[in-house]
Amino acid sequence: MAVTRDEIQRVARLARLSLSEEEIETFAEQLNRILEHVERINRLDVADVPPTYHGVALQHPFREDKPLPSLDREAVLALAPEAEAGCYKVPKITEG
């Protein structure tokens, strides 16, 4: 199924784009090459290819969720220019 110049012009009108004749030709050629490539992909025999969710096999991408020691809250807050109610206090940047 080839993309025609009329289809390019119709889509351009719907998108409110003004295309030159040269751009229409270029887009038609590019879209037709893309569609040819998709057609070649569709013809591939993938009957023996198992379905996958990811292109690369991932082996245990997540570590075990176990608690680890963290920084002391008071020591971290001592580094803050300002702190209030156990939290960093930052300048207001929005109005309202």
Swiss-Prot record:
It catalyses: L-glutamyl-tRNA(Gln) + L-glutamine + ATP + H2O = L-glutaminyl-tRNA(Gln) + L-glutamate + ADP + phosphate + H(+); L-aspartyl-tRNA(Asn) + L-glutamine + ATP + H2O = L-asparaginyl-tRNA(Asn) + L-glutamate + ADP + phosphate + 2 H(+). Keywords: ATP-binding, Ligase, Nucleotide-binding, Protein biosynthesis. It is an enzyme of class 6 (ligase). SUPFAM superfamilies: Glu-tRNAGln amidotransferase C subunit. GO terms for biological process: glutaminyl-tRNAGln biosynthesis via transamidation; regulation of translational fidelity; translation. Its EC number is 6.3.5.-. It comes from the Bacteria. InterPro entries: Asp/Glu-ADT_sf_sub_c (IPR036113), GatC (IPR003837). GO terms for molecular function: asparaginyl-tRNA synthase (glutamine-hydrolyzing) activity; ATP binding; glutaminyl-tRNA synthase (glutamine-hydrolyzing) activity. Heterotrimer of A, B and C subunits. Allows the formation of correctly charged Asn-tRNA(Asn) or Gln-tRNA(Gln) through the transamidation of misacylated Asp-tRNA(Asn) or Glu-tRNA(Gln) in organisms which lack either or both of asparaginyl-tRNA or glutaminyl-tRNA synthetases. The reaction takes place in the presence of glutamine and ATP through an activated phospho-Asp-tRNA(Asn) or phospho-Glu-tRNA(Gln). Belongs to the GatC family. This is Aspartyl/glutamyl-tRNA(Asn/Gln) amidotransferase subunit C. It comes from Symbiobacterium thermophilum (strain DSM 24528 / JCM 14929 / IAM 14863 / T). The lineage of its organism: Bacteria, Bacillati, Bacillota, Clostridia, Eubacteriales. The gene is gatC.
